[in-house]
């Protein structure tokens, strides 16, 4: 297929617009796509990228298109619809083998995208899930996989941020990340594209990326402006009207919405909060209008959210009550639109849902105004704005007043995309801009001494979008302190809930649980401040808090847990399930991982130096399994029967269970074989980067070496110890394959200390030097970690 027009039409059944062809065929990628709503920005990006990657062998190397497309949406409600659309395109083009498709909205079921760094992938997700991973603090996933996804998302990736006017302060984070990749360097090209119908280029100005005038912008071309279909869409008229709205008299509003609904069409009613939308939906249903009432917001479990979205797309005679989640990514049209007053960029998006296809001659938009007089008379003094602020939530009064002034200039009458005034919009962003110091600190994934992680919510969410993910399980009769038997939730189980609601439950002594990554269980949350955005929290199904209307703090009905498959996490610091499998010696397994890493590298075409780092790190990664503390976990009689010297892998029944293990002579709680691997590499003269990569390949020991709570302590109190290793431990000689045999080695833990003692440099100083090295840096280092981890997992699991 050598023509993008045919390629596009085969996927969509439509001819591409000229701006879409320009994106696909130009060598250079734009920085910004600024095209009116409803004209196919999503098709432009997805199909344009597919076309470029499909024909990559025909392009010059300096036109390289990143192999991962990261498509970020501001709200999870939209992810499924875009995912389904892209899946359909890939099937129509018969590209399922060449392009892998994933979605990230919480839960672990789609997290295996990081197994294949050499393959073409499209990853669709919400900005909080994607940006948290790009900042090395991935929401809703194993903390031990943070570094892999940090490395992969910041390398060889084309980031696309859709509807950036809805992103809040996260816009600045995306710009800073783009600047950091230039500052620290990456192994493969990574690019960012920002998209919106209402983009103000000044939104993309930050302290580390000040040259906004250098941004290349893709707009409608002259050919597009003469296109009859585009002209009809941009001129499609809507009759603009105003109506008073009182939350104390919802029945009046509900009655008017029903009255204005025209049979055989959709009516949208968009409200600014979940509570208002839910209350109006209930009020309309109570009046039994005789046609479907569909509620759309962000606080449903996946099955209910999908069901509602499917009804939205298929019901042609319905009232759809929604929050602002419908502003972006939903390709659907209505005849009648009710909307609360909102910031102007939001109103433009909402207006774009009305008469979207120019199919109505009598389309109408009704502005619902709850506080018209207060907004109109509000002064601009900070004190006045603060006092009025609560009534305007989740927005600010100044934004609503600005919209009101614009609307007053339009008056009541007909409006269209073409006639809406172009206003240079500002984003109200809190003063939380991530800086170089912050991203360097986030590279270290070790918790602080209190067991807490850095709260990155101010960098990845809209300022009013502070939510956690909750799920329900039947846990009656189990301990309310620690629960070991419940696995991590699948994405189907998760529901978004406000942080404020969950903190209130903790204050009321309602038992809730959070994941304990040290010991692997779920522990009771005792302090409200432990509840931070992005956390995953378990609730007893007996407590309630969920109904047909989604997350519902007032509901006490038992919640039916979602049937789920067990999710494989990366275990706790104590566990090492990846070592279960067919019998394999350290020599054989090391050879397999090096071979697999070589196969991956053959597709990535990195520099020879980088390949050497990765292959050496792979060779040394399991050297520490020769340590007696690791070998003590496997039954001696099983080892003898198998005839394997120093096994790296053993079948499940060959391992001692936890109760048996604690009685074994060389057992060490929290033992980490990969730290032993790194120490062996250093003690045997390997470069620091090889030691680091060997140590970091499970994501559990990286920049810091710190002993664990309840760790076994040597009898000699003067001995240094950490992660099950004691100063002076002797590791027997071990064959690593590839002609590399490590002699018997006495481990030296002096590098735990500042200055490093007899080793010359501490572990922290070695790691810090690596990520400050301009030839390596934080993104390359994590990328190397990820490749070794992928090779190890694929070799261990027999995956191609």
Regions found by a protein language model. Give the residues of each.
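Divalent metal-dependent catalytic cores for phosphoryl transfer on phosphate-bearing substrates
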Residues: 379-403, 605-798
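Conserved Walker A/P-loop ATP-binding site and its immediately adjacent core
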Residues: 64-89, 128-129, 274
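C-terminal helicase lobe and adjacent C-terminal extensions/tails of nucleic-acid helicase motors
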Residues: 255-256, 262, 279-289, 295-310, ...
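Conserved pre-motif I regulatory segment
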Residues: 1-34
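Interdomain hinge/linker at the junction between the two RecA-like core domains of SF2 helicases
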Residues: 189-191, 195-261
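SF2 helicase catalytic motif II
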Residues: 128-132, 137-187
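Inter-Walker segment of RecA-like/P-loop motor cores
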Residues: 90-144
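Walker A/P-loop NTP-binding motif
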Residues: 29, 42-64
């Amino acid at each position: 297929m050598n023509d993008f027009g045919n390629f596009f039409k085969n996927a969509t059944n439509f001819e591409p617009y000229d701006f879409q062809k320009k994106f696909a065929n130009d060598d250079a990628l734009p920085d910004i796509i600024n095209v009116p709503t409803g004209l196919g920005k999503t098709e432009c990006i997805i199909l344009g990228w597919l076309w470029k990657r499909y024909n990559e062998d025909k392009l010059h190397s300096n036109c390289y298109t990143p192999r991962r497309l990261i498509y970020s949406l501001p709200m999870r409600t939209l992810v499924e619809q875009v995912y389904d659309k892209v899946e359909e395109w890939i099937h129509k083009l018969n590209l399922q083998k060449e392009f892998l498709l994933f979605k990230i909205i919480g839960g672990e079921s789609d997290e295996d995208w990081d197994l294949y760094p050499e393959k073409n992938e499209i990853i669709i997700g919400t900005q909080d899930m994607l940006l948290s991973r790009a900042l090395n603090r991935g929401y809703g996933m194993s903390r031990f996989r943070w570094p892999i996804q940090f490395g992969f998302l910041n390398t060889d990736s084309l980031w696309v941020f859709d509807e950036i006017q809805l992103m809040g302060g996260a816009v600045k984070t995306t710009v800073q990340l783009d600047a950091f990749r230039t500052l620290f360097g990456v192994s493969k090209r990574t690019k960012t594209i920002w998209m919106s119908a209402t983009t103000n280029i000044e939104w993309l100005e930050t302290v580390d990326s000040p040259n906004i005038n250098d941004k290349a912008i893709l707009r409608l071309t002259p050919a597009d402006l003469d296109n009859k279909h585009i002209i009809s869409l941009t001129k499609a008229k809507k009759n603009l009207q105003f109506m008073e709205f009182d939350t104390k008299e919802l029945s009046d509003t509900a009655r008017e919405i029903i009255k204005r609904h025209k049979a055989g069409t959709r009516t949208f009613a968009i409200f600014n909060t979940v509570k208002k939308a839910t209350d109006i939906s209930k009020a309309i249903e109570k009046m039994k209008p005789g046609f479907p009432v569909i509620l759309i917001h962000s606080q449903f479990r996946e099955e209910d959210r999908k069901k509602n979205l499917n009804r939205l797309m298929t019901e042609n005679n319905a009232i759809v009550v929604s929050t602002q989640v419908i502003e972006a990514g939903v390709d659907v049209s209505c005849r009648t639109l009710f909307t609360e007053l909102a910031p102007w960029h939001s109103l433009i998006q909402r207006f774009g849902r009305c008469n979207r296809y120019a199919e109505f001659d009598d389309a109408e938009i009704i502005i619902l105004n709850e506080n018209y007089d207060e907004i109109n008379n509000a002064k601009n003094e900070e004190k006045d704005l603060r006092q009025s602020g609560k009534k305007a939530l989740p927005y600010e009064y100044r934004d609503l007043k600005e919209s009101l002034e614009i609307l007053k200039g339009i008056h009541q009458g007909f409006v269209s995309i073409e006639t809406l005034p172009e206003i240079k919009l500002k984003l109200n962003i809190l003063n939380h801009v991530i800086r170089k110091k912050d991203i360097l600190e986030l590279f270290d994934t070790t918790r602080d001494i209190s067991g807490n992680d850095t709260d990155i919510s101010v960098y990845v969410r809209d300022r009013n979008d502070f939510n956690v993910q909750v799920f329900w399980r039947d846990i009656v009769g189990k301990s309310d302190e620690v629960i070991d038997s419940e696995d991590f939730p699948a994405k189907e189980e998760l529901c978004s809930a406000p942080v404020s609601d969950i903190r209130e439950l903790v204050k009321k002594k309602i038992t809730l649980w959070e994941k304990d990554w040290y010991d692997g269980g779920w522990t009771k949350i005792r302090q409200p401040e432990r509840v931070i955005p992005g956390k995953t929290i378990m609730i007893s199904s007996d407590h309630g808090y969920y109904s047909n209307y989604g997350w519902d703090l007032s509901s006490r009905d038992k919640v039916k847990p979602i049937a789920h498959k067990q999710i494989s996490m990366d275990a706790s610091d104590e566990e090492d399930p990846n070592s279960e499998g067919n019998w394999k010696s350290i020599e054989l397994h090391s050879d397999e991982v090096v071979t697999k890493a070589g196969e991956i590298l053959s597709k990535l075409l990195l520099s020879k130096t980088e390949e050497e780092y990765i292959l050496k790190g792979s060779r040394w990664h399991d050297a520490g399994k020769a340590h007696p503390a690791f070998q003590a976990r496997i039954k001696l009689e099983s080892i003898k029967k198998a005839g394997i010297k120093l096994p790296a892998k053993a079948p499940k029944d060959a391992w001692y269970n936890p109760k048996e293990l604690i009685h074994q002579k060389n057992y060490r709680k929290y033992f980490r074989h990969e730290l032993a691997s790194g120490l062996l590499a250093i003690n045997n003269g390997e470069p620091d980067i090889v030691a680091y990569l060997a140590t970091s390949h499970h994501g559990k020991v990286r920049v810091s070496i710190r002993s664990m709570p309840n760790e076994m302590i040597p009898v000699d109190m003067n001995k240094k110890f950490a992660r099950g290793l004691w100063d002076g431990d002797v590791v027997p000689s071990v064959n690593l394959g590839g002609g590399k045999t490590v002699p018997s080695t006495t481990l030296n833990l002096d590098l735990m200390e500042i200055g490093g003692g007899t080793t010359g440099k501490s572990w922290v100083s070695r790691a810090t030097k690596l990520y400050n090295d301009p030839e390596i840096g934080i993104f390359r280092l994590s990328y190397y970690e990820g490749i070794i981890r992928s090779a190890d997992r694929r070799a261990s699991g027999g995956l191609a």
